[in-house]
Curated annotation (Swiss-Prot):
Pfam families hit by this protein: Pur_DNA_glyco
Gene3D superfamilies the record matches: Methylpurine-DNA glycosylase (MPG) (3.10.300.10)
UniProt keyword Zinc present: no
Biological processes per GO annotation: base-excision repair
Keyword DNA damage among UniProt keywords: yes
Lineage: Bacteria, Bacillati, Bacillota, Clostridia, Eubacteriales
Family, as annotated: Belongs to the DNA glycosylase MPG family.
Protein name listed in UniProt: Putative 3-methyladenine DNA glycosylase
HAMAP family reported for this sequence: 3MGH
Transmembrane segments: none
NCBIfam families xref list: 3mg, PRK00802.1-1
EC number: 3.2.2.-
Amino acid sequence: MRLGRDFYNRDTLTVAKELLGKVLVRNINGVTLKGKIVETEAYIGAIDKASHAYGGKRTNRTETLYADPGTVYVYIIYGMYHCLNLISEEKDVAGGVLIRGIEPLEGIEEMSKLRYRKNYEELSSYEKKNFSNGPSKLCMALGIDKGENGINTISSEEIYVEDDSSIKEDFSIVEAKRIGIDYAEEARDFLWRFYIKDNKFVSKK
């Protein structure tokens, strides 16, 4: 079942935790790709010095952060790598959840071609280990770039998230510091990164 607006229109920390175990769906090149979300990070606009919208900042780059809950926010890091976020809370609040890691479930051959331009069976153990265990890695595997920025996952067939009862499992959630935000003063110590314990597609344990 596809996640609706009510799922995203809640506290960002709650959304970030409850996205774990859900399935990210991407339709591209006539193929359906699916991955279980195993790692997320929460960012809460006005109060979070690690957020692009800290202090209510609004620019052309960050405007999507203020969009309807369930909207896709894609930004670029290091001038070349993309990161996928899902907007949470009410419109104009600027809450968002960064998807940091997925466990491939369906369409792995297509993901491999998008990620490495090779068939999956040709990948080295190192390449398989680093398939989708990081925000930019999963964007490459799913063919996500700035062209997907602003997509509404509530109605789009290109990208959405579903709750698939057939893959439900019990798991423990680890709460940890977010990664790569040492500039964010006290916010760098917030335990706003969440991941499924012992899952091999988590970027950093």
